[in-house]
Amino acid sequence: MADIQNISLDSPGSVGAVAVPVVFALIFLLGMVGNGLVLAVLLQPGPSAWQEPGSTTDLFILNLAVADLCFILCCVPFQAAIYTLDAWLFGAFVCKTVHLLIYLTMYASSFTLAAVSVDRYLAVRHPLRSRALRTPRNARAAVGLVWLLAALFSAPYLSYYGTVRYGALELCVPAWEDARRRALDVATFAAGYLLPVTVVSLAYGRTLCFLWAAVGPAGAAAAEARRRATGRAGRAMLTVAALYALCWGPHHALILCFWYGRFAFSPATYACRLASHCLAYANSCLNPLVYSLASRHFRARFRRLWPCGHRRHRHHHHRLHRALRRVQPASSGPAGYPGDARPRGWSMEPRGDALRGGETRLTLSARGPQ
């Protein structure tokens, strides 16, 4: 693993020497901008970005954005340096810290996705009984537990990596012997990938089975549950979970193949290793795109971040308000009669000032229920 992870690119003019910095730079820029905007949108005062009263989804999405932002800021530049430079230039402490943060944020993301899937299952399967459990306070406690577990599971990586001298070069490589490395890599696959993906699959699978099996007198409730489960937040988080499984799957598969299969060191296997890293790291910049495509309310809150968009929204609101004030009711009957199309509480009242010809100007005025 150390050998293939620290093979330098063949030559400065090779395709890899050009592609690797470009790909990692794109991941860094898109991830920083995208997740930064997600934080700015979710930290705005106001209702949930998903229009769900008392929603805990925003807190989990906020936690995912924080984990992705930490990963991109603290890990991607140094991993790019591993693949583009012949030596490690940042010292032993940074070598250990970078790899600790890689797995810390990976665990935080996977555990958060598992928590979201359970939250969505409870919202659909037990909408009333789970209301007292699915509160912002409990969501914050769940986020704290996620980071605590992530820290515990990733702590061994603080000593897993270290720096060694290879001739005149210093390299950042795994420092453990093979048996311990294999045990930790398998444990990371089981706890950081297999377990969360299994929880997500079971939670969303049971949710869909419940929705499709609901028949009889509970049909109306099932229809409402189906609408909520397939709503914007549910679809977005299911997409995010699927992307996580697809992006991190090849990374773990190659590690297992290295330990238990035939993994000869060659340019082809090196390219596979590099591609799996790029795919796993790209996962951190895909989530903001999913949120923006899934929720028009999220997009509306994003537009309010910019003064021009906010002014446009206010101008449109004022124009609509003026148009509504000029609307004359189509009905000639008294307010509130069965054929009246006017909203309840609105009536036509004469103003005191008369127009020419003895006509009285009529305006809409808001009155409470009589």
Swiss-Prot record:
<dbReference type="InterPro" id="IPR000405">
    <property type="entry name" value="Galanin_rcpt"/>
</dbReference>
<keyword id="KW-1133">Transmembrane helix</keyword>
<feature type="topological domain" description="Extracellular">
    <location>
        <begin position="258"/>
        <end position="259"/>
    </location>
</feature>
<dbReference type="InterPro" id="IPR003908">
    <property type="entry name" value="Galnin_3_rcpt"/>
</dbReference>
<feature type="transmembrane region" description="Helical; Name=2">
    <location>
        <begin position="58"/>
        <end position="78"/>
    </location>
</feature>
<comment type="similarity">
    <text>Belongs to the G-protein coupled receptor 1 family.</text>
</comment>
<comment type="function">
    <text>Receptor for the hormone galanin and spexin-1.</text>
</comment>
<dbReference type="GO" id="GO:0005886">
    <property type="term" value="C:plasma membrane"/>
</dbReference>
<dbReference type="InterPro" id="IPR000276">
    <property type="entry name" value="GPCR_Rhodpsn"/>
</dbReference>
<keyword id="KW-1015">Disulfide bond</keyword>
<feature type="transmembrane region" description="Helical; Name=4">
    <location>
        <begin position="139"/>
        <end position="159"/>
    </location>
</feature>
<feature type="topological domain" description="Cytoplasmic">
    <location>
        <begin position="119"/>
        <end position="138"/>
    </location>
</feature>
<feature type="compositionally biased region" description="Basic and acidic residues">
    <location>
        <begin position="350"/>
        <end position="359"/>
    </location>
</feature>
<dbReference type="GO" id="GO:0005929">
    <property type="term" value="C:cilium"/>
</dbReference>
<dbReference type="GO" id="GO:0017046">
    <property type="term" value="F:peptide hormone binding"/>
</dbReference>
<keyword id="KW-0564">Palmitate</keyword>
<feature type="glycosylation site" description="N-linked (GlcNAc...) asparagine">
    <location>
        <position position="6"/>
    </location>
</feature>
<keyword id="KW-0297">G-protein coupled receptor</keyword>
<feature type="lipid moiety-binding region" description="S-palmitoyl cysteine">
    <location>
        <position position="308"/>
    </location>
</feature>
<keyword id="KW-0807">Transducer</keyword>
<keyword id="KW-0812">Transmembrane</keyword>
<protein>
    <recommendedName>
        <fullName>Galanin receptor type 3</fullName>
    </recommendedName>
</protein>
<dbReference type="GO" id="GO:0004966">
    <property type="term" value="F:galanin receptor activity"/>
</dbReference>
<feature type="topological domain" description="Extracellular">
    <location>
        <begin position="1"/>
        <end position="20"/>
    </location>
</feature>
<keyword id="KW-0449">Lipoprotein</keyword>
<keyword id="KW-0675">Receptor</keyword>
<feature type="topological domain" description="Cytoplasmic">
    <location>
        <begin position="206"/>
        <end position="236"/>
    </location>
</feature>
<feature type="transmembrane region" description="Helical; Name=3">
    <location>
        <begin position="97"/>
        <end position="118"/>
    </location>
</feature>
<feature type="disulfide bond">
    <location>
        <begin position="95"/>
        <end position="172"/>
    </location>
</feature>
<feature type="region of interest" description="Disordered">
    <location>
        <begin position="328"/>
        <end position="370"/>
    </location>
</feature>
<feature type="transmembrane region" description="Helical; Name=1">
    <location>
        <begin position="21"/>
        <end position="41"/>
    </location>
</feature>
<dbReference type="Pfam" id="PF00001">
    <property type="entry name" value="7tm_1"/>
</dbReference>
<feature type="transmembrane region" description="Helical; Name=6">
    <location>
        <begin position="237"/>
        <end position="257"/>
    </location>
</feature>
<dbReference type="GO" id="GO:0090663">
    <property type="term" value="P:galanin-activated signaling pathway"/>
</dbReference>
<dbReference type="GO" id="GO:0007187">
    <property type="term" value="P:G protein-coupled receptor signaling pathway, coupled to cyclic nucleotide second messenger"/>
</dbReference>
<feature type="topological domain" description="Extracellular">
    <location>
        <begin position="160"/>
        <end position="184"/>
    </location>
</feature>
<keyword id="KW-0472">Membrane</keyword>
<dbReference type="InterPro" id="IPR017452">
    <property type="entry name" value="GPCR_Rhodpsn_7TM"/>
</dbReference>
<feature type="transmembrane region" description="Helical; Name=7">
    <location>
        <begin position="260"/>
        <end position="280"/>
    </location>
</feature>
<dbReference type="GO" id="GO:0045944">
    <property type="term" value="P:positive regulation of transcription by RNA polymerase II"/>
</dbReference>
<feature type="topological domain" description="Cytoplasmic">
    <location>
        <begin position="281"/>
        <end position="370"/>
    </location>
</feature>
<feature type="topological domain" description="Extracellular">
    <location>
        <begin position="79"/>
        <end position="96"/>
    </location>
</feature>
